[in-house]
Amino acid sequence: MPKYQFQVQVQVQPQYLPDQSAPDEGVYSFAYTITITNTGDVTAQLISRHWIISDANGHTEQVKGLGVVGQQPLLKPGEAFQYTSGCRLRTASGSMHGSYFCVAEDGEPFTCPIELFVLEAFSPGQPGQPMAARVLH
């Protein structure tokens, strides 16, 4: 039985960016705001990220890097960190999922999964109407 629990909650709010997109050229821009909350028992630092980004044609891209938006936030139990980033797809819809690699204050490494979320440029059944921002857990 572990002496403490690693637990991080990840909330995602994706948003289509019509002003930065060019659908006629196959460019669809999306922003996503992520809130990472340390719901565990121990202080932890986010070290790196790994994203798998897929479009509707099955094109998949992996993105790996240190930290998020140039930072490696240190989160005490109960603390949250929020950031906004973005990506471009060749299609009007796609998805993202991945993980964060974190290290607890005692040096113990652990991985925080990021569940799949959908990137959708247009509202279903309403072609041409940009998708409203929404929060996913």
Curated annotation (Swiss-Prot):
It holds the Pfam family DUF525. PROSITE patterns: APAG (PS51087). Residues 2-126 form the ApaG domain. InterPro entries: ApaG_domain (IPR007474), ApaG_sf (IPR036767), Uncharacterised_ApaG (IPR023065). One of its GO terms (biological process) is error-free translesion synthesis. This is Protein ApaG. The lineage of its organism: Bacteria, Pseudomonadati, Pseudomonadota, Betaproteobacteria, Burkholderiales.
